[in-house]
């Protein structure tokens, strides 16, 4: 699952060997009064395999954790540039949550990928990878992220990959994770060579070689 306002094209540089069935997911406009848990239930209905590896970037990682609760046979959840609990949110987000400012202020503008537009190079990336970005959807994302309760999953079934230069979710707030030196919040795109080299070995380290082929929604 891609991050907020991104499309599944962010995964286009990942290479999967035979035995992996990849199912790319996209954000859909949230329904009226639909919360994150109900949204996760809709996404879970799209996943038919009984042993999926769930991969999510940024807010997509938060969503995949909620999807995992609905799919008891999930193999593992892979978080990329994301948070494993509300305690890993930066302090300013936690303060906004405590004061409920996210219900009255346009916080989506502070969380989205606007920094992609700062150079011509990243502006082109922004245009290529942008997905659903309606004002209603962006406001919903900000609200649901800060309202997220985030009950912990089995730590043995979590893989957390995080860049030490992430400005959206700074590394100092992140707990146990695999650190990517120089990795930013968009490292799935601009550090794709690192992922090509390390991503599959990291996943395979969690999976027994005798297990059957893997379905990978992301």
Language model feature labels by segment:
Residues 55-64:
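Gly/Ala-rich beta-loop-alpha elbow adjacent to hydrolase catalytic centers
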Residues 160-162, 166:
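Short beta-strand/loop motif that positions the catalytic acidic residue
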Residues 36, 85-124, 128:
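Alpha-helical membrane-targeting segments
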Residues 25-27, 173, 178-183, 188-192:
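Short glycine-rich catalytic loops that host catalytic nucleophiles or stabilize transition states
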Residues 69-106, 154, 212-213:
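Flexible "cap/lid" loop of the alpha/beta hydrolase fold
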Residues 1-50, 96-104, 184:
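Active-site catalytic motif of lipid deacylating hydrolases and related acyltransferases
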Residues 34, 183-198, 215:
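Catalytic histidine-centered segment of alpha/beta-hydrolase-like enzymes
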Residues 121-155:
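Hydrophobic, aromatic-rich cap/lid helix
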């Amino acid at each position: 699952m891609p991050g907020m306002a991104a499309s599944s094209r962010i995964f286009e540089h990942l290479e999967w060997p035979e035995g992996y069935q990849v199912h790319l997911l996209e954000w859909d406009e949230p329904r009226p009064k639909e919360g994150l848990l109900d949204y996760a239930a809709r996404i879970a209905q799209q996943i038919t395999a009984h042993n999926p590896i769930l991969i999510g970037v940024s807010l997509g990682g938060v969503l995949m954790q909620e999807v995992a609760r609905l799919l008891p046979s999930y193999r593992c959840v892979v978080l990329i540039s994301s948070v494993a609990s509300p305690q890993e949110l930066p302090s300013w987000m936690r303060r906004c949550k405590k004061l409920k400012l996210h219900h009255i202020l346009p916080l989506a503008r502070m969380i989205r990928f606007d920094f992609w537009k700062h150079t011509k190079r990243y502006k082109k990336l922004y245009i290529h990878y942008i997905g659903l970005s309606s004002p209603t959807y962006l406001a919903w994302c900000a609200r649901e992220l800060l309202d997220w309760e985030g009950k912990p999953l089995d730590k043995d079934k979590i893989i957390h990959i995080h860049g030490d230069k992430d400005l959206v979710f700074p590394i100092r707030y992140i707990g146990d994770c695999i650190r990517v030196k120089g990795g930013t919040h968009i490292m799935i795109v601009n550090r794709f060579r690192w992922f090509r080299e390390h991503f599959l070995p990291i996943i395979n380290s969690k999976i027994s070689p005798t297990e059957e082929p893997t379905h990978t929604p992301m």
